[in-house]
Amino acid sequence: TMINGLGVLGWGVGGIEAEAAMLGQPMFLPQPVVVGVRVSGALPAGTTATDLVLTLTEKLRAHGVVGSFVEFFGDGLSSLELADRATLSNMCPEYGATAAFFPVDDATLTYLRFTGRGDAADLTEHYTKEQGLFRRDGDPEPVFSEVLDLDLASIEPSLAGPRRPQDRVALSNVWSSFVEAYRDHLEPGPKPSEIGRFVGEGGQPEPEEALPGGEVDPAQTAGEATIGDGSVVIAAITSCTNTSNPSVMLAAGLLAKRAVEAGLSAKPWVKTSLAPGSRVVTDYLDAAGLTPYLDKLGFGLVGYGCTTCIGNSGPLPDEVAEQIEERDLTVAAVLSGNRNFEGRIHALVRGSYLASPPLVVAYALAGRVDVDLTTEPIGHADGTPVFLRDVWPSPDEITEAVTQAVTAEQFRAQYARIFDGDERWNALDSPTGAMYAWDPDSTYVQEPPFFAGLDQADAEPTDVIGARVLVKVGDSVTTDHISPAGAIKPDSPAGRYLLERGVGQPDFNSYGSRRGNHEVMLRGTFANVRLRNELAPDTEGPWTTHLPGGEVTTIYDAATRYRDEGVPLVVLAGKEYGSGSSRDWAAKGPSLLGVRVVIAESYERIHRSNLVGMGILPLQYEAGSSASSLGLDGTETYGVRGIAGALQPGLQVTVDATRADGSVVSFPATVRIDQPAELEYYRNGGVLRTVVRGLLP
């Protein structure tokens, strides 16, 4: 989505859609609503493009732009450099839009020429001006379906969290937002994670005696680390969004320089890292002489690409992890990423905040979120308090650093060898031939079961009868909740699978790295450590209740039992189901577990498409209706009438929920198969089966 900042219209698709397109299937997109964002003013001193994009994400999520195109216009665009625009466009999935487009103007041409693409700039300028597409200040306003206003002068230093990218919070209110989100974990009494642990050890979700509780202990020493509730244990400069912006990256380096010169250092319990999205970043940090200061604070280069932002931070120091687990501490991460969904960053980190790279450095120095960085010191040097304002670089300093350190030659040199690879990459052996040779002993790649039985005709979809609810969740359940990409726990179904095959815990790697093995991925479905399944009250993690017996067990084990019993499965959800990453396994996994229907209040665009693409029927409650308003608790037996025979896009079907006492709640739901082609995919058991069947003689 970042290319939209350059005036190139593009949008993301699900992995299942992409696979189908590679095999010749057409792509379908309903005519979108186009929301215009009128931009005015300029960013105040002390604010960054990150503060702007977090404010925009909050604003657009509140307005509702799922499935819409967003287009920016107005004279305020002249104050935004191309890198700032790319930051806004790249975070488009977080506010739910299909695309976030900037028109071509002088800033676009300046960027193209600066990055060594002068010929492309000349052609772009000539073409867009001839076509009337070139933006100038004072142009007549385009016509949009809806228009919102964004005053850049109103932007303030911000973070977003601790659970969702749209939950923007002013810098001065970070601690209050943390307390509000985790009050139950910070106050005396049993915590959901403790109850979940007892369940995992064979206990009951409601023990006869209260679980150990009490006042939150004062911070205690773990090795050299003094940590407590609210401690920052991960501070990561990462993500394609922010590390592609020279202004915020050099601001982080300048802040690090001032902090080191003031005698400050990162707190010892904070795991710090730098993972830019481009090699050009380290080139200009080196050229500015700022790399040694970042290194001094622990922000050494760990690689280029997705790391902490997708859950690949690696383990915390042993003494820190032990304190978190033994005392059930509620700790935080601060990162310059796009996504901070629960359980995504690290299994031991409950709350995560998105922030600009310089604020990430500041929180590494402070080491905690129970601090107001606008009024309290970030640290002390020889007993003297040092405040954020003392080390924050001025706009002139940042501009000077960008001017002196960022050069066109850096881009040309890196682009020229972008596909070369290093010695280790080039030394890898790659298989040849038209057919892949499956290795039955591989724990990374296994032949998937999606094409089993293609020699037989698929049965027509039938009404759902006697289904049970596997998972019942609330609003904003993300694809990370459904199919996590991070670390695999040894006591999880996926971990036990790997151990049984001789894979030691140090070699578990992550769910994301093992997505070529369906046996791992179906065991990891709904395995997020922060999942709150209402069918297993007072727990967090991959738990559910097997019905009608009432046994609390893992979601994978319950699904296996239901499969053996011939019971189809249903998922009940709230609003924004499937938001976040366009993760195809968030649809493939539930399909393999036996989920036939999802009933939600609303869906994220790509996830809805992926569900259909895997043969799962997405149903949507009528406006104003929900599981709660209908009095559904998930223990009912479900039937869906209207699937057999006459199923059509947008059709209204009837859902019957039968309670244990025999009473029935019947309610209408809309079939969220939105295109005729999707109906064909659904009838064939999914898009992959449809495509492959079409290739067979």
Which functions belong to the PLM regions below?
Residues 505, 509, 513-518, 523-552, ...:
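NTP/phosphate- and nucleic-acid-binding module
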Residues 34-36, 67-71, 98-101, 147-149, ...:
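Structural motif
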Residues 1-136, 151, 248-251, 256-268, ...:
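Mobile "lid/hinge" segments at catalytic clefts and subdomain interfaces of large enzymes
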Residues 2-6, 11-19, 46-48, 80-83, ...:
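Short helix/loop capping segments that flank catalytic or ligand/cofactor-binding pockets
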Residues 378-395, 607-681:
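Acidic, glycine-rich flexible loop/linker segments
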Residues 269-291, 295-308, 312-314, 521, ...:
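Extended C-terminal subregions enriched in glycine
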Residues 3, 7, 150-289, 426-599:
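Non-catalytic terminal/interface segments that mediate subunit docking, oligomerization
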Residues 2-35, 250-257, 351-352, 357, ...:
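Extended active-site and interfacial segments that coordinate phosphate-rich ligands
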